[in-house]
């Protein structure tokens, strides 16, 4: 169980991805390999990636970081640079990302 008091300085990031039609399986495969690596990054409280049941080319990310520094460090990891920046992003038709803080 998460101690929610630890999240007072936390950062929640949600993202919505839509893969190009011919790239859905490739994106899903990349994300399956990426998620366990991201879950083990320092400062990650939660990191889940979901694929739509109704529209398989759509993906939803729910990420909780202990602070902004942890989020920035996550984006600098070798697995983020290789798998997300280097492989997945070019296979997307759409990408949206939103950041939230605990109130």
Model-identified regions with their sequence ranges:
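An amphipathic, aromatic/His-enriched active-site/gating alpha helix that lines ligand/cofactor pockets
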Residues: 39-45, 64-98
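Non-catalytic surface loops within mature trypsin-like serine protease
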Residues: 19-21, 67, 101-103
